[in-house]
Amino acid sequence: MHARRSLLKFVAAAIGLSLAGGASVALAQAKLKVAAVYTVPVEQQWVSRIHKALNAAKDRGEIEYVFSEKVANADYERVMREFAEKGNQLIVGESFAVEAAARKVAKDYPKTAFRMGSSGKPQAPNFAVFDNYIQEPAYLTGMIAGGMTKSNRIGMVGGYPIPEVNRLMHAFMAGAKEVNPKVEFTVTFIGSWFDPPKAKEAAFAMIEKGADVLYAERFGVSDAAKERGKFAIGNVIDTQREYPNTVVASALWNMEPTIDRALKAVKGNAFKAEDYGQYSLMKYKGSELAPLGTFASKVPADLVARVKAKEKDILDGKFKVAVVETEPKSTAK
């Protein structure tokens, strides 16, 4: 009888250990449920960087990732709520045009983490914000543009004159002015985040007025530059592969540092309302100057040296790019 009880205890213990082990494995393999809401197609520059970082986390097996793209502003709140109701632990998106609605949803789902591109401040307890703080590489690309223009006229095509766009344009202009004080700018906003034909037409108009370098804040600008044999400077992504003889340099935005920090916070039950914007700075590897690639031998060596020296000063904390968020104005006559 004693032997039988001992055997039963042994079996029970073994089963308990097995179950505990299984639970541990299941816990270790548990993936965060992440959803994203995008107002534009995922191939659009800005959103593509978020999409890329989230897909990387998905490929590593860290998250389950679902998203909705081309969501109209009027539908944004509804889509956010649907994702929250489905138990997604982190919801990512861009709330620039739907700020009030997005914050209302976050308030209604306090146990869900929200990390939204926003011009506003964080909202306790669960609405964190982020932004593409890539003014540092934008300054460096401006230096290159200022050194490459022959006409001393640079055209700049943007989506909307919001702080997130304005600061990049001002940084670019300041970089160009450092290298070439004579340079003048023509600035146009097309009133859309994704309208390549309209951006292209705006760029053509600038070329007609003498611009030989174009700042491509929107898709479509590089197409105009290519067709007219002019140079383009990329923003957020590097499209030199598609435009090998047109895109001289690009300011790259890397969303991985921002996304990875948010995922870590949610996993550790430490997510809170904070501003993730700083993780887009070069020191966090959140942004960088793209390799010159096909233009490595075409950009003057002395200009490359100046840019590299400035890049080092930025990384060493010896030079700080000014953040100017007012609407940039044309200076060309």
Regions found by a protein language model. Name each.
Residues A36, N88-S95, R115-G117, K209-F219, ...:
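Periplasmic-binding protein-like
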Residues G22-A28:
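Sec/Tat signal peptide C-region and signal peptidase I cleavage site
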Residues R4-A12:
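N-terminal export leaders
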Residues K107-N132, V236-T246:
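Flexible loop/hinge segments that line or gate small-molecule binding clefts
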Residues K33-R60, V66-Y76, F96, P161-R167:
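Extracytoplasmic "Venus flytrap"
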Residues K267-K333:
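Hinge/cleft segment of the Venus flytrap/periplasmic-binding protein
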Residues L54, L140-V183, V187, D275-V299:
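An alpha-beta-alpha
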Residues P122-I144, M156-P161, P244-P257:
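Short beta-strand elements at the ligand-binding edges of bilobed clamshell
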